[in-house]
């Protein structure tokens, strides 16, 4: 699903020979735009660090500090090594959600490939961390406490872990894509006044979806660190 008109529309023509659809090309372009923007923002915020923060540094410290506090409350102090991953995902998803509210911009999270990529990152990280922390004993997470039920529990647990990828992917994609559809319909009916309440709702949805994805990522990683019972 794409906007009626798009900023940086000419990139479609560049990516079309590579086999990208219009929606896929838009997602790639805006994903790179957001990543570059976040890098520039981080450089600008840390270029002249001050003991008493102000301006952009203060704004970014509030955001980053909030994410770090939530991570510590959810995972404990041993969760701090995962802060870069969690914060990066949270900021990328939040900005990706919000950028769709700007007329002519496409939110990458309204493309299922983007949300699937984020979900796979969480899935792979979860199990790499589990294996690294527990070694071969990580398999106990999939076997359950009763030995004779282990084969069945293993199958159930594998399905459960794979379903995490599907749920993370579809929850974010469904909410953002659905919101995009509603916005386009309202913009078609009344371009200036009617969409405003939906845009305000979109801001709320954008924050909630980024928060939920970040929280679930922390919970899944924390689960892989715990000892199996």
Curated annotation (Swiss-Prot):
The keyword Transmembrane is assigned to this record: yes
Major location category of this protein: membrane
Gene3D superfamilies reported in the protein's UniProt record: ATP synthase, F0 complex, subunit A
An MF annotation (GO) of this entry: proton-transporting ATP synthase activity, rotational mechanism
Transmembrane spans: 25-45, 82-102, 104-124, 142-162, 181-201, 202-222
Biological process (GO), any one: proton motive force-driven plasma membrane ATP synthesis
Protein location: Cell inner membrane
Membrane topology per record: Multi-pass membrane protein
SUPFAM superfamilies, sorted: F1F0 ATP synthase subunit A
PROSITE patterns: ATPASE_A
The family this protein is said to belong to: Belongs to the ATPase A chain family.
Function as written in the Swiss-Prot or TrEMBL entry: Key component of the proton channel; it plays a direct role in the translocation of protons across the membrane.
Oligomer and partners: F-type ATPases have 2 components, CF(1) - the catalytic core - and CF(0) - the membrane proton channel. CF(1) has five subunits: alpha(3), beta(3), gamma(1), delta(1), epsilon(1). CF(0) has three main subunits: a(1), b(2) and c(9-12). The alpha and beta chains form an alternating ring which encloses part of the gamma chain. CF(1) is attached to CF(0) by a central stalk formed by the gamma and epsilon chains, while a peripheral stalk is formed by the delta and b chains.
Protein name: ATP synthase subunit a
Organism: Citrifermentans bemidjiense (strain ATCC BAA-1014 / DSM 16622 / JCM 12645 / Bem) (Geobacter bemidjiensis)
